[in-house]
Amino acid sequence: MTKPTSAGQADDALVRLARERFDLPDQVRRLARPPVPSLEPPYGLRVAQLTDAEMLAEWMNRPHLAAAWEYDWPASRWRQHLNAQLEGTYSLPLIGSWHGTDGGYLELYWAAKDLISHYYDADPYDLGLHAAIADLSKVNRGFGPLLLPRIVASVFANEPRCRRIMFDPDHRNTATRRLCEWAGCKFLGEHDTTNRRMALYALEAPTTAA
């Protein structure tokens, strides 16, 4: 059994991430956790820590994120969610910042280890991305089109085996769907999952001319 990350969190490593698959071929099961992408200043990305749980709980209980993510949990549940990711290899929790101020939450995950792999022909090295902006005043202000190309470029550079980055917004999330379409993602249809209807998109890695 994996040792908990910090004292007082004895049950955290036992928490299962709701979307994680375990019926995996060895090639997928053996994958290390996703690599950490990077951004040039004034923006930044870092791996989330258990000490971020209070901040994330406050963010995710804000109405715009509670509606979009349905992760409006108390800090204790966020510590469990973060610990399960940090102790595993399926998903990497990240904190985004600008000018040194934390303001975003991202999860970069192996799509073949995620429930979305039930709905398309997943490659073992496909990665998926979820992202949230904490400050409502910054939503729909151009941060998505500004930062998404930089983040995905770093993901593709850090993991050259990855040929696609997947996005699965709720089918009613028109803002994220527009961003996916603006970025050039291929639409793979709407699909009913266990608790919602998602719109599935794939962003192909850029090809290099010979």
Curated annotation (Swiss-Prot):
Induction: Induced by iron starvation conditions. Transcriptionally repressed by IdeR and iron. Substrate binds at H130. Coiled coil: none annotated. Keywords: Acyltransferase, Transferase. The keyword Flavoprotein does not apply. SMART domains: AlcB. SUPFAM superfamilies: Acyl-CoA N-acyltransferases (Nat). One of its GO terms (biological process) is catechol-containing siderophore biosynthetic process. Pathway: Siderophore biosynthesis; mycobactin biosynthesis. Its EC number is 2.3.1.-. It comes from the Bacteria. The keyword Nucleotidyltransferase does not apply. GO terms for molecular function: acyltransferase activity, transferring groups other than amino-acyl groups; fatty acyl-CoA hydrolase activity; N-acyltransferase activity. The active site is at D168. Acyltransferase required for the direct transfer of medium- to long-chain fatty acyl moieties from a carrier protein (MbtL) on to the epsilon-amino group of lysine residue in the mycobactin core. Belongs to the lysine N-acyltransferase MbtK family. Monomer. PANTHER family: LYSINE N-ACYLTRANSFERASE C17G9.06C-RELATED. This is Lysine N-acyltransferase MbtK. The gene is mbtK.
